[in-house]
Every structure is written in C-alpha cells, then in structure tokens.
Amino acid sequence: MSTDEMMKAMPMADAATMDTTAMQACIDACSACLQACTMCSAAMSSMDGMGRCASMCATCADVCLAMMRMMMRPASMDAAVLRPMLEACIAVCRACMAECSSHAEMSETCRLCAMACEDCASACEAMLATLPA
C-alpha cells in the first residue's frame, strides 16, 4: 500500500479539485524534510555554536509534520486554510535552508538538510500553484 493509493481511496472535499499528484509530491517532500531536519537538529545540538541551527531545524521539522498531516486529511481540506499553511512551510523551509547552507561546507548533515529544505519549499510552491482561487 502506498500513500498515493490511500489518498485516492479517501473521500475528498475541496481536495477533489486539487492536484493529487502535487499533493502527494508535497507530502513526500515534507516527510523527507522532517526526517532530515530532525537528524540535523540532533547532530547540531551537541556542537558548540550550533544552537541556532539545531533550533531552526527542529522548528522546520515541526512545521513539515503539521503540513504533511494536514494534507493527509483530504476530506477536511480547505484551500483557504491550506494556502497560509503552505506559505508558512515555504518560509520556514527557506529560513532553515539558509541557516544550514551557511555551514554546508563544514557539515555534510547541514548540506543534506539544506537540500531537503529546498526540495520541500519547491514542492510546497508547486502545491500552492495548484490551489483553486
């Protein structure tokens, strides 16, 4: 069973007019970013001077989890609520990407996390572009 199969089997409200392919890509990107940010936060929390990075990664992981869970409930989907959540996820992912990118050359964990954040922000932007007006 894939998430995509489950999504197609679920009753939809506003989500019926939404691009489920973009939604699935966004769910997958949020999941990958959640994992990368959680691991980066754990790695950076024990390093001197990396408290801001660890905190930013933890915040990004929390936002990605909320975004992912929201999209996994399509029956209660409301584009007017989804839009600001996607915008918030994009903003947090971009901020985390900037923070991790600033130490990417000294930390492979940060480099990979920055890439996951960039992918997530892009997937959220693609999902945002599909929402009905």
Indicate residue ranges for each PLM-predicted region.
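Amphipathic alpha-helical hairpins
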Residues: 1-133
